[in-house]
Curated annotation (Swiss-Prot):
GO terms for cellular component: cytoplasm. An aminoacyl-tRNA editing enzyme that deacylates mischarged D-aminoacyl-tRNAs. Also deacylates mischarged glycyl-tRNA(Ala), protecting cells against glycine mischarging by AlaRS. Acts via tRNA-based rather than protein-based catalysis; rejects L-amino acids rather than detecting D-amino acids in the active site. By recycling D-aminoacyl-tRNA to D-amino acids and free tRNA molecules, this enzyme counteracts the toxicity associated with the formation of D-aminoacyl-tRNA entities in vivo and helps enforce protein L-homochirality. CDD domains: Dtyr_deacylase. Its main location: cytoplasm. It catalyses: glycyl-tRNA(Ala) + H2O = tRNA(Ala) + glycine + H(+); a D-aminoacyl-tRNA + H2O = a tRNA + a D-alpha-amino acid + H(+). One of its GO terms (molecular function) is tRNA binding. Keywords: Cytoplasm, Hydrolase, RNA-binding, tRNA-binding. This is D-aminoacyl-tRNA deacylase. It is found in: Cytoplasm. It is an enzyme of class 3 (hydrolase). Belongs to the DTD family. The lineage of its organism: Bacteria, Pseudomonadati, Pseudomonadota, Betaproteobacteria, Burkholderiales. InterPro entries: Daa-tRNA_deacyls_DTD, DTD-like_sf. A Gly-cisPro motif from one monomer fits into the active site of the other monomer to allow specific chiral rejection of L-amino acids.
């Protein structure tokens, strides 16, 4: 499972001209399920994401997590993160989980996030979304938890 997280001062998702999710300062997270992913990978990735230290402490070092700063988390499904771009000029999405599994894992991830974090907003699986954000830093990290083989 993959999460591309960006530290933001604000972020929002619009579907059909309606804002369906928005946060202030926190993390905007593009989330992708890959073939072979299970709730085990989702749990591990969520734990890492909520504990990942990307916010400054009093000394200006990245020593605080989104949990520590009570920041928002905006979760946006993004299957293209699993693209295989090794050959040619057209990406292959074979590494991505099938849509039914991906939706199930996204929903699971969101449910777990809501239980573990104070402020969670989401995009809409399968929708044409317009995502807006103000990247703070910029600070962007790729987190990945691969299934055990």
């Amino acid at each position: 499972m993959i999460a591309l997280l960006q530290r933001v001062t604000r972020a929002s998702v619009v579907v059909n001209d309606v804002t369906i999710g928005a946060i202030g300062a926190g993390l905007m997270v593009l989330l992708c399920a890959e073939r072979g992913d299970t709730p085990k990978e989702a749990d591990a990735l969520l734990g890492k994401l909520l504990a990942y230290r990307v916010f400054a402490d009093d000394a200006g070092k990245m020593n605080r997590s989104v949990t520590d700063v009570a920041g928002g988390v905006l979760l946006v499904p993004q299957f293209t993160l699993a693209a295989d771009t090794c050959s040619g000029t057209r990406p292959s999405f074979t590494p991505a989980a099938a849509p039914e599994l991906a939706r199930s894992l996204f929903d699971y991830f969101v449910a777990q996030a809501v239980q573990r974090h104070v402020q969670v907003a989401t995009g809409e699986f399968g929708a044409d979304m317009q995502v807006s954000l103000t990247n703070d830093g910029p600070v962007t990290f790729w987190l990945q938890v691969k299934p055990a083989i």
